[in-house]
């Protein structure tokens, strides 16, 4: 006779339907977004000035940039990395260095600023 162990397959449990919570009231977008456009323009401001400022700049810059070449780009070495203002290099092995031990870090003197990465 052979020993039969407990099966590892279990029948799936029936799913229970959970009703979504009821809406308390209408959601107002001005509570959640800073980019809400007003329904009507202000009286002292004509409607033509409410255009996208980026679109207006493209039209103005079109004539000026036609005579100029492409804008110079950053050094080819730094193109893939965003510039954070901290110019720390990787360690000697090409791997990032561990952060310094907080107990060993000296506090900078007053009036003397140091850049720490």
Curated annotation (Swiss-Prot):
Domain of life, per lineage: Eukaryota
One Pfam family, short name: GAGE
Biased composition (Acidic residues): 32-45, 87-96
Sequence segments annotated as region (Disordered): 1-117
InterPro entries: GAGE, GAGE_fam
Biased composition (Basic and acidic residues): 103-117
SMART domains tied to this protein: GAGE
Family: Belongs to the GAGE family.
Miscellaneous comment in the UniProt entry for this protein: This gene belongs to a multigene family expressed in a large variety of tumors whereas in normal tissues, expression is restricted to germ cells. These genes organized in clustered repeats, have a high degree of predicted sequence identity, but differ by scattered single nucleotide substitution. Their sequences contain either the antigenic peptide YYWPRPRRY or YRPRPRRY which is recognized by cytotoxic T-cells.
PANTHER family (UniProt xref): G ANTIGEN 1-RELATED, P ANTIGEN FAMILY MEMBER 5-RELATED
Annotated protein name in UniProt: G antigen 13
Gene behind this protein: GAGE13
């Amino acid at each position: 006779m052979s020993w039969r162990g407990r099966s590892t397959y279990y029948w799936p449990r029936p799913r229970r339907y959970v009703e979504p919570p009821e809406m308390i009231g209408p959601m107002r977008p001005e509570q959640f977004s800073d980019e809400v456009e007003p329904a009507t323009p202000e009286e002292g401001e004509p409607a033509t000035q409410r255009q996208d400022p980026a679109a207006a700049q493209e039209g103005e810059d079109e004539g000026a940039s036609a005579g100029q070449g492409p804008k110079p780009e950053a050094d080819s070495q730094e193109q893939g990395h965003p510039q954070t203002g901290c110019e720390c290099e990787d360690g000697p092995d090409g791997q990032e260095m561990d952060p310094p031990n907080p107990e060993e870090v000296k506090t900078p003197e007053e009036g003397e600023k140091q850049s720490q990465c």
